[in-house]
Amino acid sequence: MKTLLLTLVVVTIVCLDLGDSLSCYLGYKRSQTCPPGEKVCFVKSWCDAFCGSRGKRIEMGCAATCPTVKDGIDITCCATDNCNTYANWGSG
């Protein structure tokens, strides 16, 4: 009986710990668990000198809050696992 109770306690602790973490994409379909305190996934996109030939620059990751919007930078934030996909990834 004690073993069963101990097992239930351990499973509960593990499940609570796993439920508190967030995973975000950091690059092309490369996901990572966010550090403690970072509860938002984001995608930043902007044009640089090579935008015409290479497309927009993309930065992805985790943050404590949604990054501040600046001129010429598009930012999208979300708060579920791997929600910060990039539309141009396609289906491959």
Curated annotation (Swiss-Prot):
One annotated GO molecular function: toxin activity
Nucleotidyltransferase is among the record's keywords: no
This protein's UniProt keywords: Acetylcholine receptor inhibiting toxin, Disulfide bond, Ion channel impairing toxin, Neurotoxin, Postsynaptic neurotoxin, Secreted, Signal, Toxin
Signal peptide location: 1-21
Superkingdom of this protein's organism: Eukaryota
Subcellular location: Secreted
InterPro entries given in the database record: Snake_3FTx (IPR003571), Snake_toxin-like_sf (IPR045860), Snake_toxin_con_site (IPR018354), Toxin_cobra-type (IPR054131)
Secreted found in the keyword field: yes
Its job: Binds with high affinity to muscular (alpha-1/CHRNA1) and neuronal (alpha-7/CHRNA7) nicotinic acetylcholine receptor (nAChR) and inhibits acetylcholine from binding to the receptor, thereby impairing neuromuscular and neuronal transmission.
Protein name according to UniProt: Alpha-elapitoxin-Lh2a
Species annotation: Hydrophis hardwickii (Hardwick's spine-bellied seasnake)
